[in-house]
Design a protein with these regions (language model features):
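Bacterial N-terminal signal peptides
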Residues: 6-16
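Positively charged n-region of N-terminal signal peptides that target proteins for export
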Residues: 1-5
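Signature of the catalytic double-stranded beta-helix
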Residues: 114-126
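N-terminal secretory/targeting leader peptides
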Residues: 23-112, 128-333
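Sec/Tat signal peptide C-region and signal peptidase I cleavage site
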Residues: 16-22
Length: 333
């Protein structure tokens, strides 16, 4: 009978306990509101809200309304946002090796990308986690191609044009200097205006990105030569994520990881359709005119990779690991 008052007290406490306050994760992205990226993210957010019984909710700010990557990171630091879908260039200030797959002309095709990513994605995600970022996946934008207002199919042509690189991206600067090109840095949000005003004449961008960001409206030519692999990351401030209970964390990781994998699959399926769409818009496809011109691009890629490694943009150790995977994959084909 002595235990009865304790049992009654426990029941009363349970009855009047205040439920855990919902955690709303405010996420910024440059992706347009009507993009497949946003559709999949919203579907994932709805599933998470249901499975966590409202304890975890997402609110998205698409279309760059929160500013460029630098502005978004500042807002995360000031707790105005809890996370973002960011280009890997924006995350290099925390972990430089996150741009490993950006090394120019490292991959010949998507099968090679998949072989290396299967081995090293966990390493890159762990590196960001150590710097305070929870990563739900690395989302593929695809191979970037040079698109320009004036025709250009050789490195010499590119060196005469005003070529864009992302602002405050040391890795991109080292890479393009390896090709012997002097770039014009701009934020992604300013690229369309830069093309319209002739501040820049050429960009390197995946076809799906050129369509989504409307850059295709200001270019006339595409060099059909994949220059680098482009991807981003869906990240959340680890301090915020750690406030969720373990079960809710597992749900968020599962759902958003799955959705981001689907984004990569959709972007890859859309790759051919995007090329066709660019052609239908009147963009002319170019190719290196001869073997010597192609060899010059390949050598430029090698020099650009070396420059990125020498500058510390990517560690030699991780590059060698990626290269070992590539060589093993190629030898097995």
């Amino acid at each position: 009978m002595a235990l009865r008052p304790i049992a009654i007290l426990a029941c009363l406490l349970a009855a009047f306990a205040v439920p855990a306050e919902a955690e709303t994760l405010k996420i910024a992205t440059i992706s347009p509101a009507n993009s497949s990226w946003m559709r999949l993210m919203r579907e994932g957010a709805d599933e998470i809200a249901e499975r966590t019984e409202g304890r975890v909710e997402f609110k998205f700010y698409p279309g760059g309304v929160m500013g460029d990557d630098a502005a978004v990171i500042r807002k995360i630091r000031f707790r105005q946002l809890q996370g973002a879908a960011l280009t890997v260039g924006a995350l290099t200030q925390f972990y430089t090796d996150i741009q490993l797959y950006n090394l120019p002309m490292m991959f010949r095709d998507y099968d090679e990308v998949d072989a290396v990513r299967a081995e090293l994605d966990p390493v890159l995600e762990a590196g960001l986690a150590e710097e305070g970022w929870v990563v739900f996946g690395l989302g593929e934008a695809g191979f970037a191609y040079a698109m320009s207002k004036r025709p250009g199919s050789t490195i010499e042509d590119a060196r005469t044009q005003k070529v864009w690189i992302p602002a405050d991206d040391a890795g991109a600067l080292a890479a393009i200097e390896g090709f012997g090109i002097t770039p014009v840095p701009l934020s992604v949000a300013d690229v369309l205006t830069g093309l319209q005003t002739d501040l820049i004449e050429a960009v390197a961008v995946p076809p799906v990105g050129a369509l989504a960001l409307q850059w295709y409206t200001q270019v006339n030519y595409l060099l059909d030569l994949p220059l680098m692999y482009v991807y981003g990351a869906l990240t959340v401030d680890r301090n915020v994520f750690d406030r969720l209970d373990a079960g809710d964390q597992a749900i968020v990781r599962e759902v958003m990881g799955r959705q981001f994998a689907e984004i990569t699959a959709i972007n890859r399926r859309d790759h051919s359709a995007a090329f066709e769409a660019l052609g239908n818009q009147g963009i002319e496809f170019l190719a290196p005119p001869d073997d010597a011109s192609l060899a010059a691009w390949v050598e430029g890629g090698r020099a650009a990779r070396a420059r990125m490694i020498e500058s510390g943009a990517v560690s030699a150790e991780l590059f060698l690991r990626a290269n070992d995977v590539l060589e093993a994959y190629r030898a097995a084909q």
